[in-house]
Amino acid sequence: MGQKIHPVGFRLGITQEHQSRWFAEPSRYPELLQEDHKLRQYIEQKLGRLAQNNAGISEVRIERKADQIDLEVRTARPGVVVGRGGQGIEALRTGLQTLLGGNRQIRINVVEVQRVDADAYLIAEFIAQQLERRVSFRRVVRQAIQRAQKAGIQGIKVQVSGRLNGAEIARTEWTREGRVPLHTLRADIDYSYCTAKTVYGILGIKVWVFKGEIIPGQEVATPPPSPRDRDRDRGDRDREPRRRQQQRRRQQFEDRSNEG
């Protein structure tokens, strides 16, 4: 079951949160759901992968309070969203108000993605961009996995489907590094799907990222230390005796100067 079901929907209320957090009267639910879809579609058109200024939008979360809409935009390049002097975010707010009609109160909060190479949607977006430039899919997938491993994840699985490298017959190939426990509910798994439009047709990209297990009472999965951090810690430990020797030499030198 864990292999087939959507990993995020399977864990809603356990380790994952809803992307839309609001309640409404039953008669208004269809209208508000359409509004949410329009908001996300507009932001994707203006700042997404196919836009002129790609801001690397990872996720858009929507909250509603009375007649106010709160948007949390998680992006890899917050400077592109905010713009010079806040002009970009004001233009985005004006466009969204025009889209919804009326003078709606819209508050936009821009959040920077801390680990870009560990975000499933941004990884899938990177692979799609490279495939559209006719780069070999094996090379792109290997590069994306290496970048994700350097970001400190515990496991990743990438699946690409379609006419790979322009083959006559479509096929599906996938690669996995590390652990990706899809059956474990406490596993913090980030999943995303993206499409690449090539001259041979559409390629589908699926990415699963395992960031660690969330223990009850613990909000965020603690990532394991990256090899670079371990090397840095080992280097610090190696440098400590040298520092002590240098301090001892300085003290001895100072003692000699005081005696003289």
Swiss-Prot record:
Cellular component GO terms held in the UniProt record: cytosolic small ribosomal subunit
Superkingdom of the source species: Bacteria
Domain KH type-2: start-end pairs: 39-114
UniProt xrefs under InterPro entries: KH_dom, KH_dom-like_a/b, KH_dom_type_2, KH_sf_prok-type, Ribosomal_S3_C_sf, Ribosomal_uS3_bac-typ, Ribosomal_uS3_C, Ribosomal_uS3_CS
MF terms (GO), sorted A to Z: mRNA binding; rRNA binding; structural constituent of ribosome
CDD domains: KH-II_30S_S3
GO biological process, one term: translation
Basic and acidic residues composition bias: residue spans: 227-243, 251-260
One Pfam family of this chain: Ribosomal_S3_C
Region (Disordered): 218-260
This protein's UniProt keywords: Ribonucleoprotein, Ribosomal protein, RNA-binding, rRNA-binding
UniProt KW RNA-binding keyword: yes
Assembly and oligomerization: Part of the 30S ribosomal subunit. Forms a tight complex with proteins S10 and S14.
NCBIfam families: rpsC_bact (TIGR01009)
Purpose: Binds the lower part of the 30S subunit head. Binds mRNA in the 70S ribosome, positioning it for translation.
Family the UniProt entry places it in: Belongs to the universal ribosomal protein uS3 family.
Protein name: Small ribosomal subunit protein uS3
Organism listed in the record: Nostoc sp. (strain PCC 7120 / SAG 25.82 / UTEX 2576)
